[in-house]
Regions:
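Envelope-exposed proteins and targeting segments
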Residues: 110, 127-131, 136-140, 173-175
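A mature extracytoplasmic/lumenal domain signature
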Residues: 116-120, 129-131, 139, 144-148, ...
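Structured, beta-strand-rich domain cores
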Residues: 123-127, 153
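Early exported N-terminus immediately downstream of N-terminal targeting peptides
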Residues: 31, 38-90
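Polybasic, proline/glycine-rich intrinsically disordered low-complexity segments
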Residues: 149-199
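Sec-dependent signal peptide recognition
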Residues: 2-9
Length: 199
């Protein structure tokens, strides 16, 4: 596995509306969006210098994604919620080929963005997981804006996120993301992201 994986930095981004992006879909299906996003403001876009393009093997991407776990925050009086995998096996089956292709064509000013819609529970409520990734200083940054967030309407849950996968549907609630390899916390934030992430 690439040495780069040892330098993973991860953040949970919740409740942040984010700046104005242009999203260019690479894979655009009813239940999946993978694409490239950059600042709409060209002066901001040219200031971003991510380490793209880059080629990840599908095996490396699978090894990273399957080890990401989230423990979402609750209220002050709530007990700790159990850890959940960020991506289901079905999510990874859909995501990995598209991420593999998209990282290879991403430019330094781009973020790789994703959104996956699915149903869960007896009610088959529509949910979305969305966010983005970028490579900087030989470290992969992963931003999770929504994690299995219930979609209340087509406008909020589908159209808004297709326009900007960094758009969060919920209020700031914080959370922890873990990389299972060491089962230790790599990074924790609430309402923000790591490094030179979108602001």
């Amino acid at each position: 596995m690439k040495r780069i994986i040892a330098g993973i930095l991860i953040a949970l981004c919740v409740g942040c509306a984010g700046p104005v992006f242009v999203t260019r879909p690479i894979e655009d299906e009813p239940s999946l969006l993978v694409g490239l996003a950059s600042y709409n403001d060209q002066s901001k876009a040219t200031a971003i210098r991510h380490d793209h393009p880059v080629e990840w093997s599908k095996a490396d991407l699978h090894a990273i994604l399957k080890r990401l776990f989230i423990q979402e925050g609750g209220g002050l009086m709530d007990s700790a919620r159990p850890r959940q995998a960020v991506f289901s096996p079905e999510d990874m089956t859909s995501l990995i080929p598209s991420l593999h292709k998209t990282f290879k064509i991403a430019q330094p000013s781009d973020w790789i963005v994703f959104a996956i819609w699915g149903s869960s529970g007896k009610s088959q409520t529509l949910e979305v997981t969305s966010g983005g990734m970028f490579l900087e200083d030989q470290r992969l940054h992963i931003i999770v804006a929504n994690h299995r967030e219930r979609v209340s309407s087509a406008k909020d849950g589908i159209h808004a996120i297709r326009s900007n996968p960094f758009h969060s549907l919920s209020d700031v609630k914080g959370g922890l993301i873990f990389f299972q390899a060491a089962m230790s916390l790599i990074h924790e934030t609430a309402g923000s992201s790591v490094g030179s992430n979108p602001r």
